[in-house]
């Protein structure tokens, strides 16, 4: 889709990296400096998007089919899967349209292409924002279930969960439309970066607090049964490893994209920043990878959901 470089748009077109560039090599930027540029083949990008699409569709179908999964927690997980599905689907659609236009198989006026690009970018941006929000909502839900266990079902009701879901979707669509319309303003990009950092801090604080409570609980059980300290240390190490993986994946998959937005504001013309801008497709691919990993972390670990998914797949055959 015709744009003047990925730094000129919030999401930009997926043709910011030339297809003729080697998969991993050195490219020259506008100042003549040598840059490390990772080019993602269109086939690989579409394949990852398809895997994410299928995975998240299965999660949505499994939760919709099993009434036992119609709880606030699974409501958030289902919406996270739907957001990831839209992230993958919109990026796949944009890539497919660009390839068809490039090959001459699809003819359209420039104005129509630009409008289509705007619509796809709004869908992509809103699904990204909602995905981050639902990750935060899942963290809050788990926090309440641990620290307010006796009052959990009165605090987190299905009606309240649905209101939160509706608010997230409406806010995501509204703000993404504004972000795309005013993406040339530095304040818009900074708002997105601040939002990402806020979600990262929220998740880190909540999960670290939950880990501390789990360690205290394990220590209390160990003292009650007069067990040795290594049992408590084992729980702490396992919890710390899980927390590191969860937050590490979140940061590694989303961080580069928001670093890209930050550098657009701070150093749009600097040679080093220009080199980073060339890897925009890689940053989008990492977000697609996050959409693949999310169901493995939040959905498929549920035995009830796996049983439902197995029944759905067997019935489809």
UniProtKB/Swiss-Prot annotation:
Side of membrane Cytoplasmic, spans: 64-72, 141-163, 212-240, 301-317
Main localisation: membrane
Record keyword rRNA processing present: no
Keywords tagged on the record: Cell membrane, G-protein coupled receptor, Glycoprotein, Lipoprotein, Membrane, Palmitate, Receptor, Transducer, Transmembrane, Transmembrane helix
Coiled-coil residue spans: none
InterPro entries: GPCR_Rhodpsn (IPR000276), GPCR_Rhodpsn_7TM (IPR017452), Melcrt_ACTH_rcpt (IPR001671), MSH_rcpt (IPR000761)
Topological domains annotated Extracellular: 1-37, 94-118, 184-191, 267-279
GO molecular function: melanocyte-stimulating hormone receptor activity
Description of how the protein assembles with itself and partners: Interacts with MGRN1, but does not undergo MGRN1-mediated ubiquitination; this interaction competes with GNAS-binding and thus inhibits agonist-induced cAMP production. Interacts with OPN3; the interaction results in a decrease in MC1R-mediated cAMP signaling and ultimately a decrease in melanin production in melanocytes.
Task of the protein: Receptor for MSH (alpha, beta and gamma) and ACTH. The activity of this receptor is mediated by G proteins which activate adenylate cyclase. Mediates melanogenesis, the production of eumelanin (black/brown) and phaeomelanin (red/yellow), via regulation of cAMP signaling in melanocytes.
Protein family according to the UniProt entry: Belongs to the G-protein coupled receptor 1 family.
Official protein name in the record: Melanocyte-stimulating hormone receptor
Organism (species): Trachypithecus obscurus (Dusky leaf-monkey)
